[in-house]
């Protein structure tokens, strides 16, 4: 299989105060979220001038991917499309069509399976192609990459860097806590039994081992919606409170569920959780995400090369008890389980 282009597909985010509410309305469309709740969330963005870091990080990642493609002698233009804000995926796919692109690889900024981590991106692809009409390019979503060696390496290195920011006497006993985005239990049951949770748990174990930790915790963050709807638990804030009560003096939090330092990292962890830790007398260090590292660009191009060359997926050696689904075409589901 060959490709004419690469599409980086992401979530999107506002880039000015006037964009915050329209963006949040796009994100929550059809979910009946009260406006007062949206206004409360909007304050998180307005704290940073109404600008989410995600689009800037993705543009930097595209630059890094272009450099990696050039280094490998692969002449592929890189396009950028989002689900919830400009550049919208529908507009990007139309531009690809107009530029004569016939088949493109799609790299999404989610390493995971499950509805939120994978299926929604398949829906984005299908929606973009439908909007572009019969001459839309074929779009091949690249595989889930939660167990790619470079992802594990980047997070392990980030943990070491975060540990070094703690006061030296606290480093040895600092508790390592992995966190990922919580989802409703109903959503967690789609795409196979507990697929998302199992992938996150497996990846956390790989990263902990690579970072030299045998003991660690894995929790969830950033839940939303009505309190009567059950979501994955424990919450990172509740877990931090329990650690503080048990006498823990230092915590390293690794946001393994995210590939960039977007608003749910810089607000939920760097602001809210950091404030909670300070009040509890716990030293908190947050590991960085891959963002636009050259290694993350290398990972993206590795996935393209796997498809072009028909190579087996690069995975951390050893037995993997957790499924990770491969590439799929034009928004088709990676597994029929996601249609259940």
From Swiss-Prot:
Pathway: Porphyrin-containing compound metabolism; protoheme biosynthesis. The keyword DNA-binding does not apply. GO terms for molecular function: ferrochelatase activity; metal ion binding. InterPro entries: Ferrochelatase, Ferrochelatase_AS, Ferrochelatase_C, Ferrochelatase_N. GO terms for biological process: heme biosynthetic process. It is found in: Cytoplasm. It is an enzyme of class 4 (lyase). It catalyses: Fe-coproporphyrin III + 2 H(+) = coproporphyrin III + Fe(2+). Gene3D superfamilies: 3.40.50.1400. The keyword Cytoplasm applies. Fe-coproporphyrin III binds at residues 52, 121. Keywords: Cytoplasm, Heme biosynthesis, Iron, Lyase, Metal-binding, Porphyrin biosynthesis. Its EC number is 4.99.1.9. Fe(2+) binds at residues 181, 264. GO terms for cellular component: cytoplasm. It comes from the Bacteria. It holds the Pfam family Ferrochelatase. Involved in coproporphyrin-dependent heme b biosynthesis. Catalyzes the insertion of ferrous iron into coproporphyrin III to form Fe-coproporphyrin III. Belongs to the ferrochelatase family. This is Coproporphyrin III ferrochelatase. The lineage of its organism: Bacteria, Bacillati, Actinomycetota, Actinomycetes, Mycobacteriales.
